[in-house]
Design a protein with these regions (language model features):
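C-terminal motif of bacterial Sec signal peptides marking the signal peptidase cleavage site
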Residues: 2-3
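Short, well-structured beta-strand
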Residues: 8-11, 105-182
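Post-signal peptide N-terminal segment of mature Sec-exported envelope proteins
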Residues: 12-33
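Residues that act as N-cap/strand-start positions at coil-to-secondary-structure junctions
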Residues: 22, 29-31, 58, 117, ...
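Secretory pathway targeting signatures of secreted, lumenal, and periplasmic proteins
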Residues: 33-91
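Short secondary-structure junctions
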Residues: 41-53, 98-112
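Short, solvent-exposed helix-to-loop capping segments enriched in aromatics
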Residues: 90-99
Length: 182
């Protein structure tokens, strides 16, 4: 038997080669929503009526679904006011990001300031975490929007990295084209 005399060579782990679609964008600008932005044509927007089994806080929560990648960008919006004070919303956003510190080995944050006058923070959580990409956008007086990218897969940074990088480009485009309507 030839197989008995051959040397064993371990094989490295392999991942599927992904074919990414061409970057093309469309506008989300539905009547009644306090914001608008551009998102990729290979994604769809769905109204998010439930949040962990409970009714969503308001009608402006959405998911941007990436069906080819089994991912979704969860967008939650809150109007700043007596029940949603800016400091509290800001603290909640940081705390939600910090919940990943058990699995994360680093959290990078960068300030967002766009040509449209939008400000916020972009978080990259590194490690095998449920949501590596998170951000919030605000005008600090009326509007607060938070986004988090999730995949329907067990977190594995190595296998998700190519898809993560591809969709992060779309998220950054969304942020750059984002506008408050009022």
């Amino acid at each position: 038997m030839a197989a008995c005399n051959s040397n064993y060579t371990p094989k490295p782990k392999g991942y599927f080669q992904l074919q990414f679609p061409k970057k093309q964008y469309q506008t989300f600008n539905l009547a009644g929503y306090p914001y608008s932005f551009e998102y990729p044509k290979y994604a769809s927007v769905e109204k998010d009526s439930l949040f962990f089994g409970e009714k969503a806080e308001n009608d402006w929560w959405i998911n941007i679904v990436f069906p080819s990648f089994s991912g979704r960008l969860h967008i939650s919006y809150k109007q700043i006011g007596p029940q949603n004070q800016f400091d509290s919303l800001l603290r909640d956003s940081y705390e939600l990001t910090q919940k990943h510190t058990q699995k994360a080995y680093a959290i990078e944050d960068s300030i967002i300031t766009t040509a449209n006058g939008i400000e916020g923070m972009f978080f990259k959580v590194q490690g095998d975490v449920a949501t590596e990409t998170q951000f919030f956008l605000t005008d600090s007086t009326r509007h607060f929007l938070r986004g988090a990218l999730y995949f329907e897969a067990t977190p594995n940074q190595d296998s998700l990295q190519p898809v993560q990088q591809f969709i992060v480009q779309d998220i950054k485009h969304l942020i750059q084209t984002f506008r408050w309507k009022n």
